[in-house]
Amino acid sequence: ARGLGDEGITLDAGAETQESDLPAIGKSAAGIITALNYSPYLDTPKNKDFVKRYKAQFGPDAIPSLASMGAYDAMHVIAEMIKATDGKRDGEAAMAAIKGYSWESPRGPVSIDPETREITQNIYIREVKPVEGGLMGNVPIFTYENVVEPWHAMQKK
């Protein structure tokens, strides 16, 4: 991405500007706007606590990514399924337990559609800006709330 700005080229991306890649891109990433379902810079108590615990586990310079957030939420749902089945191996009961399930994730409110099992979640418009420690980060600038997976939403019409 170095030099693209000098050539008047705007890089439109999604996960390509994740925090783990931004140190290599550097300040030339400033102003890139992306849409994604997570940013470690979400200003919510749940996310701040998640980031704090993540850094405690993986080091003070570690920054949660979309992948680590996905793993966190997946384990949350698996734990709910285990609770619902009292630890028994019962796939039908486990799936029934999460039909229509909703929770407050560090990425915001998430719910599972009881029919399609697709999730509804917020999508954040993020802009790469300077953040603490001289780093660049994807800072949320707008939120689309409760976004339904587009394919299934179109099929319901």
What are these regions (language model features)?
Residues 1-157:
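Extracytosolic ligand-binding ectodomains
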